[in-house]
Amino acid sequence: AKQGCNVVVNYCHGATAAAETAALCKELGVEAVTVQADVSTAEGCKKLFEEAVNAFGRVDILVNNAGVTRDNLILRLSEEDFDTVLNANLKGAFLCCKEAARRMVRQRSGRIINLSSVVALRGNAGQANYAASKAGLIGLTKSLAKELAGRNITVNAVAPGLIETDMTAALPEAVRTGMLHSIPAGRAGKPEDVANAAAFFAAEQSSYLTGQVLCVDGGMAM
């Protein structure tokens, strides 16, 4: 929104948060709409993109940032929790990429940014499902980058480390302290750090970058 882009805010359950996000976008002088849709289903993705096109006429930028966790050690990790995470984090991104690519190929332009994670590169005990989903996003990113580059469409990934969010705030103090010790910068990042990376990949300045994974992690993945 700060770069002058109209915004479509997708949500599945968080209507209030989506409305607040849209309101913040409008305060910056752009148009914004919210769309309730489950992106882990083809029907939900189709609805999302149809409403986006109805609102603004085209889709120029896709940011796949849906993410859920269902943490547990492998011996306790249920098939249901594995499927829930893979469906939301990886299948949903695949379906959204497919809908976006269909339109961007016709436009001969577009930007796709996938939100991965440093756990895709490092692994993390108790997060086999989450790490697998985020590692899958990197493979998806690189494959689609090769498929779509000839149509002036870039596909890149941002891999955040420990970021100050509601989800990380709920971590036990011992876990949080251990994670901070593994970060050379010695601190957690801010949501703005991730947003700035995504905005860079969406901008004209990054038009010759595709298939890249940018770690926003204070050196955690080195």
Which residues make up each language-model segment?
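Substrate-binding pocket helix/loop in short-chain dehydrogenase/reductase
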Residues: 45, 73-74, 78-86, 168, ...
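Catalytic Tyr-X3-Lys loop
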Residues: 68, 75-94, 109, 113, ...
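Short-chain dehydrogenase/reductase
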Residues: 1-56, 70, 79-81
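Active-site loop immediately N-terminal to the catalytic Tyr-X3-Lys motif
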Residues: 75, 122-128, 150-151, 186, ...
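Active-site helix of classical SDR
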Residues: 97, 133, 141
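C-terminal substrate-recognition "lid" of short-chain dehydrogenase/reductases
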Residues: 109, 153, 187-216, 221
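Residue(s) in the substrate-gating loop at a strand-loop-helix junction
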Residues: 117
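Alpha-helical segment proximal to the catalytic Tyr-Lys
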Residues: 102, 146-150, 207
